Design a protein with these regions (language model features):
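Conserved G1/Walker A P-loop phosphate-binding module
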Residues: 1-120, 126, 133, 144-145, ...
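C-terminal-of-GTPase-core extension/linker across diverse P-loop GTPases
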Residues: 2-6, 11, 17, 145, ...
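Helix N-terminus capping/helix-initiation residues
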Residues: 45-46, 124, 187, 254
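Short, conserved glycine- and acidic-residue-centered signature motifs
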Residues: 81, 137, 221
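Glycine-rich, flexible loop segments associated with nucleotide phosphate handling
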Residues: 121-129, 210, 224
Length: 277
């Protein structure tokens, strides 16, 4: 399983990746500090596997692993190649699912940028999610148009391709209305046709709501987190609250220290453990 970690610049994406993999990717307060994707492979925590290993003492224990890819931050216009858009979209296409890191904290020392990377704007989770959604959808529209073109030419020699033209034409209208391919309603046969196009907005998505320490302590009282929850619920996506800064500290602790730290916070497992699982 390969998960692509995406997000606008300065939302805490690389800090979160560092905590997940301890890979030490540069994390700085300026856009595009992640230009080439950093890749880390992480073992999935599994208490059952730990128990079996303790019981039977095998020569080798091989846990399930997840590959995380820290993908370059993007800005509005990525689907047209602005910023690092082309790299961003190509890297996402190679992933099985998307982890979208959304900024849910205020910090006057960290710029919040969307389109103009020199302009600081108010924190807006809904707007941030919308920027990335639209860029993926616009890229998908171009892909769908090419599929329609190809199917129309093929249909001249084989009428079975007419169904592809119909399906992709309906999907194009859906995408042009600002909807993701994930939310397009169709039967299994049509879903198989669409799946073959490997569309970006068809990929499963998990929202990692990045909070500050105060917000993480009671995420459901955080107004930004509530916005992310509501948007995720509309498409049946999962939301995991994290505090990237805190998770980076936790990642440096050994097993017993980590447990004590989490106990002090009053939580059973870190946001990263939930994300990796």
């Amino acid at each position: 399983m390969k998960l692509g970690i995406v997000g606008l610049p300065n939302v805490g994406k690389s800090t979160l990746f560092n905590a997940i993999t301890n890979a030490g990717a540069e994390s700085a307060n300026y856009p595009f500090c992640t230009i080439d994707p950093n890749v880390g492979v992480v073992a999935v925590p599994d208490h059952r596997l730990d128990a079996l290993t303790e019981m039977y003492h095998p020569k080798k224990t091989t846990p399930a692993v997840v590959e995380f890819v820290d993908i370059a931050g993007l800005v509005k216009g990525a689907s047209k190649g602005q910023g690092l858009g082309n790299k961003f979209l190509a890297n996402i296409r190679e992933c099985d699912a998307i982890v979208h890191v959304v900024r849910c904290f205020d910090d006057e020392n960290i710029m919040h940028v969307v389109a103009d990377t020199s302009t600081n704007v108010p924190v807006d989770p809904a707007g941030d999610i919308g920027v990335i959604d639209i860029e993926l959808i616009m890229a998908d529209v171009e892909m769908v148009e090419r599929r329609i073109d190809k199917a129309q030419k093929a249909a001249k020699g084989d009428k079975k391709y007419l169904r592809e033209v119909e399906v992709f034409s309906a999907l194009k209208d859906w995408l042009n209305d600002g909807n993701s391919a994930r939310s397009f309603d169709c039967d299994e046969d049509d879903a198989a046709i669409i799946a073959a196009a490997e569309l970006l907005s068809l990929k499963p998505i998990i929202y990692a709501a990045n909070l500050d320490e105060e917000g993480f302590a009671d995420c459901h009282a955080n107004a930004y987190y509530k916005v992310v929850e509501e948007l995720a619920a509309k498409e049946g996506a999962q939301v995991i609250p994290v505090c990237a800064k805190l998770e980076a500290e936790i990642a440096e602790l050994d097993g017993e220290e980590k447990k004590m730290f989490l106990d002090d916070l009053g939580i059973a497992e870190s946001g990263l453990d939930r994300l990796i699982k």
